[in-house]
Amino acid sequence: MTFKWNVHYTGSKGNSVSIYTNQFNILVDAGKPYKFIEPLLYEKHFLIFTHRHGDHFKPAVYKKIRENFPNIKILANEEVSNLMFEKTKIPADVVFSDNFQFQIGTMKFTTIQNYHGAGEELVDCHGLIIEDIESGEVLLYATDLSTTIDYQEYLDKNSLQVDYFLLESNYDPQVIEFYESTKAHTGFDIFSNGSYRHLSSTEHKEFTEKYCKPDSIVVPLHQSETYSTFEGLIKRTKKDENRLTMEEVEEWKKSKNK
Protein backbone atom coordinates (compact mmCIF):
# COMPACT_ATOMS: atom_id res chain seq x y z
CA MET A 1 0.00 0.00 0.00
CA THR A 2 1.47 3.33 -1.14
CA PHE A 3 -0.83 5.45 1.01
CA LYS A 4 -1.86 5.47 4.64
CA TRP A 5 -4.12 7.95 6.39
CA ASN A 6 -5.72 8.84 9.68
CA VAL A 7 -8.97 10.78 9.88
CA HIS A 8 -8.41 12.55 13.19
CA TYR A 9 -11.40 14.88 13.01
CA THR A 10 -14.13 15.37 10.42
CA GLY A 11 -17.33 17.39 10.50
CA SER A 12 -18.62 20.78 11.52
CA LYS A 13 -16.83 20.60 14.90
CA GLY A 14 -13.39 20.47 13.27
CA ASN A 15 -11.38 18.81 10.52
CA SER A 16 -7.85 17.39 10.35
CA VAL A 17 -6.58 14.39 8.39
CA SER A 18 -3.08 12.90 8.05
CA ILE A 19 -2.03 11.43 4.71
CA TYR A 20 1.20 9.43 4.53
CA THR A 21 3.04 8.53 1.32
CA ASN A 22 6.43 6.95 0.69
CA GLN A 23 7.78 10.39 -0.29
CA PHE A 24 6.10 12.93 2.01
CA ASN A 25 3.53 13.28 4.78
CA ILE A 26 0.69 15.80 4.77
CA LEU A 27 -1.69 17.18 7.35
CA VAL A 28 -4.87 18.45 5.71
CA ASP A 29 -6.49 21.26 7.73
CA ALA A 30 -6.10 22.17 11.39
CA GLY A 31 -9.61 23.04 12.45
CA LYS A 32 -9.38 22.23 16.17
CA PRO A 33 -7.72 23.99 19.13
CA TYR A 34 -3.93 23.78 19.12
CA LYS A 35 -3.74 21.18 21.91
CA PHE A 36 -5.51 18.73 19.59
CA ILE A 37 -3.51 19.66 16.48
CA GLU A 38 0.01 19.76 17.98
CA PRO A 39 0.41 15.95 18.31
CA LEU A 40 -0.50 15.55 14.64
CA LEU A 41 2.27 17.80 13.34
CA TYR A 42 5.28 15.62 14.04
CA GLU A 43 6.87 13.98 10.98
CA LYS A 44 4.75 16.15 8.66
CA HIS A 45 6.35 17.84 5.67
CA PHE A 46 3.34 19.83 4.49
CA LEU A 47 0.19 21.34 5.96
CA ILE A 48 -2.49 22.19 3.42
CA PHE A 49 -5.53 24.29 4.24
CA THR A 50 -8.54 23.57 2.04
CA HIS A 51 -10.51 26.76 2.80
CA ARG A 52 -11.08 29.53 5.32
CA HIS A 53 -14.01 28.19 7.35
CA GLY A 54 -13.32 27.94 11.07
CA ASP A 55 -13.71 24.17 11.25
CA HIS A 56 -10.72 23.91 8.87
CA PHE A 57 -8.57 26.98 9.59
CA LYS A 58 -8.07 28.88 12.84
CA PRO A 59 -5.70 31.89 12.77
CA ALA A 60 -4.53 31.42 16.38
CA VAL A 61 -3.71 27.77 15.74
CA TYR A 62 -1.94 28.65 12.50
CA LYS A 63 0.22 31.21 14.32
CA LYS A 64 1.30 28.65 16.94
CA ILE A 65 2.10 26.12 14.24
CA ARG A 66 4.35 28.68 12.55
CA GLU A 67 6.10 29.39 15.84
CA ASN A 68 6.61 25.78 16.91
CA PHE A 69 6.95 23.91 13.60
CA PRO A 70 8.84 26.29 11.28
CA ASN A 71 10.02 23.48 8.99
CA ILE A 72 6.52 22.46 7.91
CA LYS A 73 5.65 24.04 4.56
CA ILE A 74 2.20 25.63 4.49
CA LEU A 75 0.07 25.42 1.36
CA ALA A 76 -3.14 27.41 0.93
CA ASN A 77 -5.24 29.06 -1.74
CA GLU A 78 -5.14 32.83 -2.15
CA GLU A 79 -8.22 33.47 -0.03
CA VAL A 80 -6.78 31.54 2.93
CA SER A 81 -3.30 33.02 2.50
CA ASN A 82 -4.77 36.53 2.53
CA LEU A 83 -6.61 35.70 5.75
CA MET A 84 -3.37 34.33 7.21
CA PHE A 85 -1.62 37.60 6.46
CA GLU A 86 -4.52 39.68 7.75
CA LYS A 87 -4.62 37.84 11.08
CA THR A 88 -0.98 36.89 11.68
CA LYS A 89 1.10 38.81 9.09
CA ILE A 90 2.45 35.44 7.88
CA PRO A 91 1.16 34.23 4.49
CA ALA A 92 1.35 30.67 3.21
CA ASP A 93 4.67 29.37 1.85
CA VAL A 94 2.93 28.18 -1.30
CA VAL A 95 -0.22 29.84 -2.65
CA PHE A 96 -2.04 27.54 -5.03
CA SER A 97 -4.99 27.75 -7.38
CA ASP A 98 -7.05 25.16 -9.25
CA ASN A 99 -5.03 22.29 -10.74
CA PHE A 100 -1.80 23.28 -9.00
CA GLN A 101 0.69 20.42 -9.26
CA PHE A 102 4.01 19.33 -7.86
CA GLN A 103 5.87 16.04 -7.86
CA ILE A 104 8.29 14.58 -5.33
CA GLY A 105 9.82 11.28 -6.36
CA THR A 106 7.01 9.16 -7.74
CA MET A 107 4.28 11.17 -5.99
CA LYS A 108 2.28 13.62 -8.09
CA PHE A 109 0.08 16.05 -6.14
CA THR A 110 -2.80 18.01 -7.73
CA THR A 111 -5.27 20.45 -6.17
CA ILE A 112 -8.86 20.31 -7.43
CA GLN A 113 -11.50 22.99 -7.01
CA ASN A 114 -14.40 22.29 -4.65
CA TYR A 115 -17.64 24.19 -5.21
CA HIS A 116 -18.59 25.12 -1.64
CA GLY A 117 -21.42 27.65 -1.48
CA ALA A 118 -23.01 29.84 -4.13
CA GLY A 119 -23.11 33.50 -5.14
CA GLU A 120 -21.79 35.80 -2.44
CA GLU A 121 -21.34 32.83 -0.11
CA LEU A 122 -19.04 30.96 -2.50
CA VAL A 123 -15.85 30.03 -0.67
CA ASP A 124 -12.56 29.30 -2.44
CA CYS A 125 -12.12 25.65 -1.51
CA HIS A 126 -9.95 22.78 -2.75
CA GLY A 127 -9.43 19.07 -2.43
CA LEU A 128 -6.56 16.99 -3.75
CA ILE A 129 -5.56 13.96 -5.76
CA ILE A 130 -2.25 12.20 -5.14
CA GLU A 131 -0.95 9.73 -7.72
CA ASP A 132 1.92 7.29 -7.37
CA ILE A 133 3.08 7.30 -10.99
CA GLU A 134 5.16 4.17 -10.38
CA SER A 135 2.56 1.89 -8.77
CA GLY A 136 -0.47 3.54 -10.36
CA GLU A 137 -2.21 3.96 -7.00
CA VAL A 138 -4.42 7.04 -6.59
CA LEU A 139 -5.77 8.74 -3.44
CA LEU A 140 -8.52 11.36 -3.54
CA TYR A 141 -9.35 13.67 -0.64
CA ALA A 142 -12.33 16.02 -0.81
CA THR A 143 -14.76 17.49 1.69
CA ASP A 144 -17.03 20.56 1.77
CA LEU A 145 -18.11 20.36 -1.87
CA SER A 146 -21.48 20.30 -3.58
CA THR A 147 -20.42 18.54 -6.79
CA THR A 148 -17.66 16.20 -8.00
CA ILE A 149 -17.65 17.59 -11.53
CA ASP A 150 -14.05 18.87 -11.40
CA TYR A 151 -12.81 15.53 -10.05
CA GLN A 152 -14.64 13.70 -12.80
CA GLU A 153 -13.07 15.96 -15.40
CA TYR A 154 -9.55 15.36 -14.06
CA LEU A 155 -9.98 11.60 -13.69
CA ASP A 156 -11.52 11.26 -17.15
CA LYS A 157 -8.85 13.42 -18.78
CA ASN A 158 -6.08 11.34 -17.22
CA SER A 159 -7.85 7.96 -17.53
CA LEU A 160 -7.63 7.35 -13.78
CA GLN A 161 -9.51 5.17 -11.33
CA VAL A 162 -9.17 5.74 -7.59
CA ASP A 163 -7.80 3.30 -5.00
CA TYR A 164 -8.59 5.36 -1.90
CA PHE A 165 -11.51 7.76 -1.54
CA LEU A 166 -11.52 10.09 1.45
CA LEU A 167 -14.71 11.80 0.34
CA GLU A 168 -17.53 13.73 1.94
CA SER A 169 -20.92 12.03 2.30
CA ASN A 170 -22.79 14.66 4.26
CA TYR A 171 -26.52 14.05 4.02
CA ASP A 172 -29.11 11.66 2.64
CA PRO A 173 -31.65 13.60 0.51
CA GLN A 174 -34.37 11.15 1.57
CA VAL A 175 -33.81 11.94 5.25
CA ILE A 176 -34.26 15.65 4.58
CA GLU A 177 -37.30 15.01 2.36
CA PHE A 178 -38.93 12.91 5.08
CA TYR A 179 -38.21 15.46 7.81
CA GLU A 180 -39.64 18.29 5.74
CA SER A 181 -42.83 16.26 5.23
CA THR A 182 -43.49 15.85 8.95
CA LYS A 183 -45.04 18.17 11.50
CA ALA A 184 -41.74 18.04 13.39
CA HIS A 185 -40.23 20.24 10.71
CA THR A 186 -40.11 23.87 11.82
CA GLY A 187 -40.14 25.43 8.37
CA PHE A 188 -36.37 25.93 8.40
CA ASP A 189 -35.08 25.28 4.88
CA ILE A 190 -32.41 22.68 5.65
CA PHE A 191 -31.06 22.39 2.14
CA SER A 192 -30.84 26.09 1.35
CA ASN A 193 -29.33 26.88 4.75
CA GLY A 194 -26.32 24.64 4.48
CA SER A 195 -26.75 21.27 2.85
CA TYR A 196 -26.35 22.68 -0.67
CA ARG A 197 -22.71 23.39 0.21
CA HIS A 198 -22.05 19.70 0.82
CA LEU A 199 -22.05 16.39 -1.03
CA SER A 200 -25.04 14.10 -0.64
CA SER A 201 -24.72 10.39 0.06
CA THR A 202 -26.35 9.61 -3.30
CA GLU A 203 -23.80 11.66 -5.25
CA HIS A 204 -21.02 10.14 -3.12
CA LYS A 205 -22.20 6.65 -4.03
CA GLU A 206 -22.56 7.40 -7.76
CA PHE A 207 -19.10 8.96 -7.95
CA THR A 208 -17.24 6.29 -5.98
CA GLU A 209 -18.92 3.46 -7.88
CA LYS A 210 -18.01 5.05 -11.21
CA TYR A 211 -14.33 5.65 -10.40
CA CYS A 212 -13.48 2.81 -8.02
CA LYS A 213 -11.20 -0.13 -8.69
CA PRO A 214 -12.31 -3.65 -7.65
CA ASP A 215 -10.53 -3.37 -4.29
CA SER A 216 -10.93 0.37 -3.65
CA ILE A 217 -11.33 1.66 -0.10
CA VAL A 218 -13.99 4.32 0.53
CA VAL A 219 -13.89 6.47 3.68
CA PRO A 220 -16.91 8.79 4.09
CA LEU A 221 -16.13 12.21 5.56
CA HIS A 222 -18.17 14.99 7.19
CA GLN A 223 -21.30 12.90 7.78
CA SER A 224 -24.11 14.92 9.35
CA GLU A 225 -25.12 13.52 12.73
CA THR A 226 -28.74 14.41 11.99
CA TYR A 227 -29.29 14.16 8.25
CA SER A 228 -27.05 11.31 7.05
CA THR A 229 -29.33 8.56 8.42
CA PHE A 230 -32.93 8.17 9.57
CA GLU A 231 -31.58 6.90 12.90
CA GLY A 232 -29.67 10.15 13.37
CA LEU A 233 -32.77 12.23 12.66
CA ILE A 234 -34.85 10.19 15.11
CA LYS A 235 -32.19 10.60 17.79
CA ARG A 236 -32.10 14.35 17.13
CA THR A 237 -35.87 14.69 17.68
CA LYS A 238 -36.34 12.26 20.58
CA LYS A 239 -36.68 15.09 23.12
CA ASP A 240 -38.95 17.18 20.90
CA GLU A 241 -42.70 17.42 21.41
CA ASN A 242 -43.21 15.98 17.94
CA ARG A 243 -40.51 13.34 18.13
CA LEU A 244 -40.15 11.02 15.17
CA THR A 245 -40.15 7.23 15.08
CA MET A 246 -38.91 4.56 12.69
CA GLU A 247 -42.54 3.50 12.22
CA GLU A 248 -43.27 6.92 10.72
CA VAL A 249 -40.26 6.54 8.45
CA GLU A 250 -41.51 3.17 7.18
CA GLU A 251 -45.01 4.56 6.58
CA TRP A 252 -43.54 7.47 4.63
CA LYS A 253 -41.44 5.12 2.50
CA LYS A 254 -44.53 3.03 1.72
CA SER A 255 -46.49 6.13 0.69
CA LYS A 256 -43.69 7.15 -1.68
CA ASN A 257 -43.75 3.74 -3.37
CA LYS A 258 -47.49 3.78 -4.06
Predicted regions and their residues:
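Glycine/small-residue-rich loop that forms an oxyanion/phosphate-binding "nest" at active or ligand-binding sites
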Residues: 58-59, 64-121
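Extended recognition/assembly regions associated with phosphoester-bond processing machinery
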Residues: 2-8, 16, 62, 142, ...
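Catalytic core of the metallo-beta-lactamase
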Residues: 100-168
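Conserved beta-strand hairpin/beta-sheet module of binuclear metal-dependent hydrolase folds
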Residues: 1-40, 124-144, 164
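Cap/insert and terminal regions of metallo-dependent hydrolase folds
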Residues: 152-252
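Active-site metal-binding motif and surrounding structural segment of the metallo-beta-lactamase
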Residues: 33-79, 161-163
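Active-site metal-binding loops of divalent metal-dependent hydrolases
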Residues: 10, 30-32, 52, 79, ...
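Short, charged/polar "capping" segments at the starts of alpha-helices
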Residues: 36, 79-86, 175, 226-230
